[in-house]
């Protein structure tokens, strides 16, 4: 399960907020601010403050990140050829980094991101706060 893999990969000193993207209650112990579903206003606020997003590589989500200039680690849903194609295509863009679900690890948080907007330069520091949007709409953002 992607949610569990992400939770085990996030550095322990991280301040994060999780948006799970489902009304189904989590079976994992989430010890930080989290939402099963977030109202659009809250999601907009979190995305506008984000330094980093970790997300599935769906078209609409990618368009949001591109518009905002937010660096994103894209994790395509296994077997979803459109998501796999989009993540591979964008992997050459310095704003995006593709990570396969099987390759999720703490090391992916060391990714250096220089977005086109200059919003983030240098190493991503998770202890500045983060948002994880998991399951169907997985994403991790670091609010400023």
Regions found by a protein language model. Give the residues of each.
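Donor-nucleotide binding loops and adjacent catalytic segments primarily
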Residues: 1-52
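Hydrophobic beta-strand scaffold residues
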Residues: 16, 72, 97-98
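Short, acidic/turn-prone active-site loops that include or flank metal/cofactor-
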Residues: 21, 37-41, 77-82, 103
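Short, charged, surface-exposed secondary-structure boundary motifs
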Residues: 27-29, 44-48, 83-88, 107-109
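Short acidic active-site motifs
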Residues: 41-42, 61, 107-108, 130
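A donor-sugar binding/catalytic signature common to diverse glycosyltransferases
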Residues: 42-85
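C-terminal amphipathic helix plus adjacent low-complexity
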Residues: 109-144
């Amino acid at each position: 399960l992607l949610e569990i893999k992400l939770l085990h990969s996030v550095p322990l000193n991280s301040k994060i907020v999780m948006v799970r993207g489902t009304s189904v209650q989590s079976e994992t112990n989430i010890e930080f601010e989290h939402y099963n579903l977030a109202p659009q206003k809250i999601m907009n606020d979190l995305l506008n403050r984000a330094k980093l997003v970790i997300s599935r590589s769906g078209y609409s989500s990618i368009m949001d990140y591109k518009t905002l200039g937010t660096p994103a680690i894209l994790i395509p849903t296994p077997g979803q050829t459109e998501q796999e194609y989009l993540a591979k295509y964008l992997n050459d863009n310095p704003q995006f980094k593709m990570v396969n679900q099987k390759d999720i690890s703490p090391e992916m948080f060391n990714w250096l991101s220089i977005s086109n907007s200059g919003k983030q330069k240098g190493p991503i520091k998770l202890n500045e706060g983060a948002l994880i949007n998991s399951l169907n709409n997985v994403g991790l953002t670091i609010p400023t």
